[in-house]
Amino acid sequence: MMQSITSKALVLYNRNFREDDKLVKIFTEQAGKRMFFVKHATNSKLSPVIQPLTLANLLMKVNDDGLSYIQDYQDVQPFTRINSDLFIMAYATYVAALADASIPDSQPDAALFAFLTKTLELMEEGLDHEILTNIFEVQILSRFGVSLNFHECVFCHRTGLPFDFSFKFSGVLCPDHYREDDRRCHLHPNIPFLLDQFQAVEYSTLETISLKAEIKQQLREFIDQIYDDYVGIHLKSKKFIDSLGDWGSILKDKENKESI
């Protein structure tokens, strides 16, 4: 069944189909994620609006049983800053892929759509893309059926203490209950504290974020552990982010040599 709708929409990715056509995966606010067919994409009037990480209002023919079609568009927002920086673009691509993996196609999820687009808008504004990604990863866990409490000890329910995380109990332990899990994570107390903050933070109150490099690295490693143990997905875009550390080191070495 085909129906015409107008909706705010974000392009997740596109891929070549046949000689000059494209299949475009788009997350729409009203109709969820859909695959669109664009004929003669290179010279199509739709070319500006089918590029990855492009936000626009689309007039669409949505098909519940097959490919959908874009009829017209307006208010294109291309995220220029993101697309001009390899590192930011990698993180933006990853959060988009994570959103794609978190819900079935054709399932409307206006809250997730708003969360994803706001994450990209804050990256575009220049807020720390790594920390924004961490916040996104933590808050989207519920879409994968994962609920973790970083706020209170799983045994005594006290708050505001130097917690450590236990995979055995899927929650945090206070110092009095560290003994309950010999294989607890031995995290820096700032890590559970920050994850508790990330779970609760609202973007409307977020003006600036800044963390030391070693804390950011520990956050990255621990969130990776959470996704490995509880979610079990392995996205190509995440593997690319992991490889960026090597590229960053190469670029820094080159800059240091040129400055000597």
Swiss-Prot record:
| Name listed for the protein in its UniProt record | DNA repair protein RecO
Q: Which SUPFAM superfamilies match?
A: ArfGap/RecO-like zinc finger, Nucleic acid-binding proteins
What is the stated purpose of this protein? Involved in DNA repair and RecF pathway recombination.
Which is one Gene Ontology cellular component term of this protein?
Answer: bacterial nucleoid
For this chain, the family text in UniProt reads:
Belongs to the RecO family.
Keyword match DNA damage: yes
Gene this protein is translated from: recO
InterPro entries the UniProt entry points to:
ARFGAP/RecO (IPR037278), DNA_rep/recomb_RecO_N (IPR022572), NA-bd_OB-fold (IPR012340), RecO (IPR003717), RecO_C (IPR042242)
* Domain of life from the UniProt record: Bacteria
What's in the keyword line of the UniProt record?
DNA damage, DNA recombination, DNA repair
Task: Give the taxonomic lineage as stored in the record.
Answer: Bacteria, Bacillati, Bacillota, Bacilli, Lactobacillales
An annotated GO BP:
double-strand break repair
Q: Which organism is it from?
A: Streptococcus gordonii (strain Challis / ATCC 35105 / BCRC 15272 / CH1 / DL1 / V288)
The keyword DNA damage appears for this protein: yes
One Pfam family named in its UniProt record? RecO_C
